[in-house]
Amino acid sequence: NLWRTTPDIQANWKSVVGTYEINVNLFKYAGKGNWNDPDMLEVGNGKLDDNENRAHFSLWCMLAAPLMLGNDIRSFVSNGMPDKDNETLKIVTNKHMIAVDQDSLGKSAKRIKKESGIDIIARPLSNGDVALCLFNTASSTKSVNFKLDDLTKDPYLGIEESPSGYELHDLWTDERSTGTTINATIPKHSTVVYRVKPTI
């Protein structure tokens, strides 16, 4: 079951962010078998650049939204074959982000912090991991420092404190690391997304 939560989305950054802002506050209504629908993806449409397209897709995956492509998929093909250099195709086929979107727990992301143009949103996953997204809503590059133990303070996320640190999987670069904090420099209108797992 799904229900539209907003008017039709438009292929511009203002509309993407406005739609996100409404839906991130509706997290408690999403769950297994029922989803908020913030409308189709505008990835690859209009004047959205690659960072904005990646952020748009990241946010919809974090919101457990239905992923319905709104672009012309013929642009994904070159000489009758998938164009492996097509940046939009790379974005919408990111298997790590799709796995977050389609996680069987079905819970949507909750905004856990908002500071200096950075939204920090997180959602619990069925295996006990947490998907964590750092979203730069500002029109300039921002730096952020986030203590991962802060995730354990919100019962909604259900993650255990891990004194020895956390395993981090960057879902866009596919890089893996361990640590207790995230220090990131994020370009304007961009996201960084991690899958976080206690090392205990």
Language model regions located:
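Glycan-recognition surfaces
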Residues: 1-72
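Generic recognition of flexible, low-complexity loop/linker segments
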Residues: 47-48, 117-122, 181-182
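Catalytic cores of secreted or luminal carbohydrate-active enzymes
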Residues: 55-113
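Carbohydrate-binding surface patches
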Residues: 60-63, 68-70, 114-156
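Hydrophobic, well-ordered secondary-structure elements that form the walls
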Residues: 132, 168, 189
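Short acidic/proline- and small/hydrophobic-mixed sequence motifs that coincide with surface turns
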Residues: 140-144, 163-164, 177
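Solvent-exposed beta-hairpin/edge-strand motifs
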Residues: 150-173
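C-terminal beta-strand-rich structural cap/linker in extracellular carbohydrate-active enzymes
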Residues: 179-200
